[in-house]
Curated annotation (Swiss-Prot):
The UvrABC repair system catalyzes the recognition and processing of DNA lesions. UvrA is an ATPase and a DNA-binding protein. A damage recognition complex composed of 2 UvrA and 2 UvrB subunits scans DNA for abnormalities. When the presence of a lesion has been verified by UvrB, the UvrA molecules dissociate. It comes from Agrobacterium fabrum (strain C58 / ATCC 33970) (Agrobacterium tumefaciens (strain C58)). Residues 331-609, 629-958 form the ABC transporter domain. Belongs to the ABC transporter superfamily. UvrA family. One of its GO terms (cellular component) is excinuclease repair complex. It holds the Pfam family UvrA_inter. Forms a heterotetramer with UvrB during the search for lesions. This is UvrABC system protein A. It is found in: Cytoplasm.
Length: 973
């Protein structure tokens, strides 16, 4: 059979698609573009990917299927020519604190193998390589214990491994051994209970029981030799009379202890031990370097690298306040007189009053309040009618909160205390996450933790020259491992992530970064014959790195894959082999293929809006004149040092539209979000944000509100929707409750809520669907057969306005809602603001968890726009053009500039040059990412920036300003 040349789709009707018929070439780079909400994702993800994935999963056995997420069958007549599909979406990787860039890309797994096979252990005490111990050295060490010490000499034959071990125990009995220690208990071998093979076990053989005496060297040597033979070079001397406190054992919750570690013990190894300090490394194997395994994880922080500690700066966030005014944050909200009476007693002892500012207290007094007192103090308490006196040490706020945090079972109390805690690097492992034994193993003078903290760029150089520093035997072992590591580092470099470090927590990555990491992992896997579907991989990527990303996508295509990319980036569209433009507009007005073919075909098609923007017929105009910043009206940040910022001092002018630009990882978000926004939120809005390190910030007196409009979901449950979030649902319910029929029945607005009993359908509890769990198939959501998906009971649905019930209103698009409620300003204005941000196509009651990041951000923007402006608000947006077509960018810019016209200030972090060129002022941070960035490269108007040689942004902006004519801001029709 000849190989299929196309993916043929017939009758695709998922979501708003209007029965699309389409033939896509296989093994090509295909870009799907079109207005936001036109149906690109419905076609790429919900139809093509869903069907490719579903068919692959269906080919597996029923047993395997239960572990995989099954996709629903999309609404399509027929698809031919599909391959197994892999989707790489915009979701951030993992919120798990144990997940790092190294573990996600599997580079860390290869590094563990490398260190286990060619690493050399060094003694922390002497700094010299560790040699193996001889039996005589072990005997001398035991004889040095106090005479009369009772010991068990044990051979650890099983250490933290799963299994039943019946055969091994029977073998031991044959050899004449009688007792074993299993999971912390001693047993006669015949009496050992059956072990569950699903759990990890520890088994030590009791080789000898001895009391230390000078004349027993020969017997000890004999016993130790037996141990070393049994346990592959290991032996343990356990002190029979020195039990460990319960909290230091595995049973007491110490995750990184062997179950057999119930008493103090000394581990001997004929492999690795320091003769001076006796520091011993049990066995060098890959799991010793895993911070997710008890054998490698640092016992203090359980391999997290940081510990939650009460932070004194959060206890006293505003030191200029007086004690009575609430300088001590955890006590400020309480109405109980107890806290003030406690402070009065401390004041008598340390000479301060409640009217004193925190900064005026002596160091001794501050220490006493925060950390407690050694001396006893007299406290007088009066509680209504009761008064009493007590003399005691004062525990201190910090120890008190830490104790309560450890002891409490209440999640609420824990959360409350965590507001005053911050993560500090673990003092035991210095943030490297591993045991001292693992950090003692080095290659070329560095341990594994130091290598993971390098940037990917530096690590790549280090691994390149590593073979020169290894001997012939080490090189022979390492050659294949190094090849894998180098390749993966190269791919990360190719997708523009060379500024990240391998130890970076994956939860702190942006959506674009985590998508590109997964992309790098996919290239590393080297699969061919696969269908890849990607969602805007260029998000968060500077124009400079775009070419490298596109090369990566072309590489995926060249090795024999079909790559479908949903993308708005001009370079990506022009690089594609085949472009599909979906439109003509959003929502119900979209869902059709407007143009398809090569980029030139699309540009030549008069119907294609995308084509008009690509050919330059339409465009975002450069403003004829830019607003001039007023002298002195600015927020100035001094000495910002968070993450990679290098003592940055920069001013953000107010009353203008400012763009913060620069390459990925340069420090834009650290400067704008972590430093400026968090300080402003704290000072202006009283929020409990912890800003990144800086000296001071001036100019907050010019603003009365600061709002960060980000891309996080507007709600995580299906019950949250645009109407509830923007506040439109309240006037809608009030309106229905005011209708004559509702009044006659005595219905209040609560009757029209699907979240509370009364008006909602109780069969599905207002969800409209009922979830049925199917173990080998995807969970099935069936429409509720009582309310038929309407979410309300019949009585509530009897109340109608213009023939529509409340359920019909929730099912309207925003555009229909604006028309329907034209005579109800309270509802119309809120829906109009959603329509203005280009969301006319979403349903009024659309579930929040089905909105994309860009849509969620625009819903938030609409909510802010519908509020009455004070003209003194600072709006901060991080990449607002995510998911926006050129045409939508035009609309968005109109709205942002409208906010500025009202006297507000707008600051955006942006890579999109169409936005940057319309800015009044630019702050360019860089020049490189990571350690090569963190400086202000240039500030000024776009025309000023293009003259700065060091600015990458200026370089790309120059091409654009030279190419496009100036004019008024073009209205988006």
């Amino acid at each position: 059979m000849s190989e299929l040349k196309t993916i043929s789709i017939r009758g695709a009707r998922e979501h708003n698609l209007k029965g699309i018929d389409l033939d896509l070439p296989r093994n090509k780079l295909i870009v799907m573009t079109g207005l936001s909400g036109s149906g690109k994702s419905s076609l790429a993800f919900d139809t093509i990917y869903a069907e490719g994935q579903r068919r692959y999963v269906e080919s597996l056995s029923a047993y395997a299927r239960q572990f995989l997420e099954m996709m629903q069958k999309p609404d399509v007549d027929q698809i031919d020519g599909l391959s197994p599909a892999i989707s790489i979406e915009q979701k951030t990787t993992s919120r798990n604190p144990r997940s790092t860039v190294g573990t996600v890309t599997e580079i860390y797994d290869y590094m563990r193998l490398l260190f286990a096979r060619v690493g050399v252990p060094y003694s922390p005490a002497t700094g010299l390589p560790i040699e193996s111990q001889t039996v005589s050295q072990m005997v001398d060490r035991i004889l040095a214990f106090e005479e009369g010490t009772r010991l068990y000499i044990l051979a650890p034959i099983v250490r933290g491994r799963k299994g039943e071990y019946k055969k091994e125990l029977a073998e031991l009995m044959k050899k004449g051994f009688q007792r074993v220690k299993v999971d912390g208990q001693f047993y006669e071998i015949a009496d050992v209970p059956a072990l569950d093979k699903k759990y990890k076990h520890d088994i030590d053989v009791v080789v000898d029981r001895a009391v230390v005496r000078p004349d027993m060297a020969a017997r000890l040597a004999d016993s130790l030799e037996t141990c070393l033979k049994l346990a592959d070079g290991l032996a343990i001397a356990e002190f029979a009379d020195k039990p460990l406190p319960p909290e230091d054992t595995a049973a007491g919750g110490s995750a990184n202890k062997s179950l057999n570690e119930t008493h103090e013990r000394v581990l001997f190894s004929e492999k690795f031990a320091c003769p001076v300090s006796g520091f011993t490394i049990p066995e060098i194997e890959p799991r010793l370097f895993s911070f997710n395994n008890p054998f490698g994880a640092c016992p203090s922080c359980d391999g997290l690298g940081s510990q939650q500690k009460v932070d004194e700066n959060l206890i006293v966030p505003e030191p200029a306040r007086t004690l009575r005014d609430g300088a001590i944050a955890p006590w400020a909200k309480s109405s109980s007189p107890y806290y003030n009476q406690t402070l009065e007693a401390l004041g008598k002892a340390f000479g301060f009053k409640l009217s004193s500012k925190w900064t005026d207290l002596s160091k001794e007094a501050q220490h006493a309040i925060l950390q407690g007192t050694d001396d006893k103090i007299e406290f007088n308490y009066q509680d209504g009618a009761r008064s009493y006196k007590t003399v005691k040490n004062f525990e201190g706020i910090v120890p008190n909160l830490e104790r309560r945090w450890k002891e409490t079972d209440s999640a609420w109390a824990r959360e409350e205390i965590e507001r005053y805690m911050s993560a500090a690097p673990c003092p035991a492992c210095a943030g490297y996450r591993l045991k001292p034994e693992a950090l003692a193993v080095k290659i070329n003078k560095l341990h594994i933790g130091e290598v993971t903290q390098m940037s990917i760029r530096k690590a790549r150089d280090w691994f390149e020259v590593l073979p020169e520093n290894l001997n012939a035997k080490q090189n022979e072992i390492a050659v294949r491992i190094l090849k894998e590591i180098r390749e993966r580092l190269r791919f990360l470099n190719d997708v523009g992530l060379d500024y990240l470090s391998l130890s970076r927590n994956s939860g702190t990555l942006s959506g674009g970064e985590s998508q590109r990491i997964r992309l790098a992992s996919q290239i590393g896997s080297g699969l061919t014959g696969v269908l890849y579907v990607l969602d805007e991989p260029s998000i968060g990527l500077h124009q400079r790195d775009n070419a490298r990303l596109l090369e990566t996508l072309k590489h995926l295509r060249d090795i024999g894959n079909t790559v479908i990319v949903v993308e708005h980036d001009e370079d990506a569209i022009l690089t594609a082999d085949y472009v599909v433009d979906i439109g003509p507009a959003a929502g119900i007005h979209g869902g059709q293929v407007i143009a398809e073919g090569t980029p030139q075909d699309v540009m030549a098609n008069p119907k294609s809006l995308t084509g008009k923007y690509l050919s330059g017929e339409l465009g975002v105009a450069v403003p004829a004149e830019r607003r001039k910043p007023k002298k002195g009206r600015e927020i100035k940040v001094f000495g910002a040092r968070g993450n990679n910022l290098q003592n940055v001092t920069a001013a953000v002018p107010l009353g203008v539209f400012t763009a913060v630009t620069g390459v990925s990882g340069g420090g834009k978000s650290t400067f704008l979000i972590e430093t400026l926004y968090k300080s402003a939120a704290r000072r202006v809005m009283g929020a409990r944000e912890i800003p990144a390190e800086h000296d001071r910030i001036d100019g907050f007196e010019f603003i009365d509100k600061v709002i960060d409009i980000d891309q996080s979901p507007i709600g995580r449950t299906p019950r949250s929707n645009p109407a509830t979030y923007t506040g439109a649902f309240t006037p809608i319910r009030d309106w229905f409750a005011g209708l004559p029929e509702a009044k006659a029945r005595g219905y209040a607005p609560g009757r029209f809520s699907f979240n509370v009993k009364g008006g909602r359908c109780e069969a599905c509890q207002g969800d409209g669907v009922i979830k049925i769990e199917m173990h080998f198939l995807p969970d099935v959501y069936v429409t509720c057969d009582v309310c038929h998906g309407k979410r309300y009971n019949r009585e509530t649905l009897d109340v109608t306005f213009k023939g529509k019930s409340i359920a019909d209103v929730l099912d309207m698009t925003v555009e229909e809602g604006v028309e329907f409620f034209a005579a109800v300003p309270a509802v119309r204005d809120k829906l109009q603001s959603l329509f203005d941000v280009g969301l006319g196509y979403i349903k009024v009651g659309q579930q929040a968890n089905t909105l994309s990041g860009g849509e969620a951000q625009r819903v938030k923007l609409a909510k802010e726009l519908s509020k009455r402006s004070t003209g003194r608000t600072l709006y901060i947006l991080d990449e607002p053009t995510t998911g926006l077509h050129f045409h939508d960018v035009n609309k968005l810019l109109e709205m942002l500039h409208a906010l500025v016209e009202q006297g507000n200030s707008v600051v955006v972090i942006e890579h999109n040059l169409e936005v940057i060129k319309t800015a009044d002022w630019i702050i360019d941070i860089g020049p490189e990412g990571g350690t090569g960035g963190g400086e202000v490269v240039a500030t000024g108007t776009p025309e000023d920036i293009v003259k700065v040689e060091r600015s990458y942004t200026g370089h790309f902006l120059k091409e654009l300003l030279d190419r496009r004519p100036a004019g008024k801001r073009e209205a988006a029709e």
